[in-house]
């Protein structure tokens, strides 16, 4: 068992595949009150284990009489990878919440949101135009509308006022959830001052700035990304420290390396997710952030080559457990493969993809006399 697994003598946690409806039923009120909409508590337990219902669908569980049972069910059914919410209200996105390493073992929840970057040195007209492109990008696929999901605001200037102004402009122009990207706590504070009601993702806490970033995350009740490039031991250490500070909503970035570094990236993402889902390592039980955008910071090549590499990197990270992606390109041939692959990856393998049944008219049928 890894250092993040259960202590010696503690009962090993069950995976979602090992939890039976009986395990859940024993902790339910067992009154068959039907407030959940099911005929009895056993039917509710069965659908709960299958991920079709939530504990919140059982009102009696939230009364003082059943508080102990509610807490036990929370622990029993909690996913090994925590769910983290970015944004607020109807515009919020959930990332993580994974139960299994391999999709076919159960199903994947919370399809990977794709964020597109903007930066604080863009002229306002260019910034607003890019926001319109991000929000306007959509594609109809098998009756579903596929879209982008978030905006990442990067500090290129390194200036707090400039960054704050850019964040303000984005908030006024867009309803999308935000990722604020700077390693300078003073610059981040300016961005958070503009986005304090929007619960953005703070990117990122590192070995050198974790204390200041932790204070900002606590003050603004915002999720915090943890960045330790190609150093899983440091990543675990930072997570442990931040948890001890009282921060529960963390997102892990082990670094996105391209070209010769891509195998290391795949290995790191896989190791983290395997530790969480197979060994129940709580320090690695957080959503993973992939940044295909990094292809634009490497070797200077033609735009088409860089876009192709970004496409490749994004597809690989989607396949290897990334719960959130930050990208740069807005070309259809770069984004559509990600949106379509995401849709197919996050379909429930227990339920075939289908379209609404019905009779449809094609053309103009003529009467027999014609």
What are these regions (language model features)?
Residues 29-47, 56-60:
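Local cysteine-cluster metal-coordination motifs and their immediate loop/turn environment
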């Amino acid at each position: 068992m890894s250092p993040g697994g259960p202590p010696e003598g503690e009962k090993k946690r069950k995976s979602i595949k090992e939890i039976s409806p009986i395990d859940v039923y024993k902790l339910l009120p067992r009154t068959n009150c039907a407030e959940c909409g099911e005929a009895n508590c056993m039917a509710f337990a069965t659908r709960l284990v299958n991920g079709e219902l939530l504990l919140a669908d059982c009102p009696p569980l939230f009364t003082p009489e059943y508080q102990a049972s509610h807490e036990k069910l929370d622990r029993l059914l909690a996913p090994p990878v925590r769910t983290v919410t970015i944004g607020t209200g109807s515009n919020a996105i959930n990332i993580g919440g994974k139960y299994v390493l391999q999709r076919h073992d159960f199903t994947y929840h919370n399809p990977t949101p794709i964020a597109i970057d903007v930066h604080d040195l863009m002229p306002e007209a260019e910034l607003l135009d890019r926001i319109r492109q991000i929000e306007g990008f959509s594609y109809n696929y098998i009756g579903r509308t596929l879209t982008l999901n978030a905006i990442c605001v990067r500090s290129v200037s390194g200036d707090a006022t400039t960054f704050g102004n850019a964040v303000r402009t984005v908030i006024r122009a867009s309803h999308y959830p935000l990722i604020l990207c700077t390693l300078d706590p003073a610059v981040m504070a300016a961005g958070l001052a503009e986005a304090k009601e929007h619960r953005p993702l703070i990117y990122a806490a590192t070995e050198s700035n974790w204390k200041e970033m932790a204070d900002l995350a606590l003050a603004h009740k915002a999720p915090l990304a943890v960045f330790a490039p190609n150093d899983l031991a440091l990543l675990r250490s930072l997570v442990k420290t931040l948890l001890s500070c009282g921060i529960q909503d963390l997102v892990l970035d082990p670094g996105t390396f391209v070209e010769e570094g891509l195998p290391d990236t795949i290995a790191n993402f896989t190791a983290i997710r395997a530790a969480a889902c197979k060994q129940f390592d709580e320090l690695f039980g957080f959503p993973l952030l992939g940044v295909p955008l990094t292809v634009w910071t490497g070797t200077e090549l033609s735009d088409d080559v860089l876009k192709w590499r970004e496409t490749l990197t994004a597809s690989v990270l989607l396949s290897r457990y990334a719960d959130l992606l930050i990208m740069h390109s807005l070309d259809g041939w770069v984004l559509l493969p990600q949106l379509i692959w995401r849709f197919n990856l996050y379909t429930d393998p227990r339920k075939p993809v289908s379209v609404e049944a019905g009779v449809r008219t094609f053309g103009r049928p003529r009467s027999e006399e014609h």
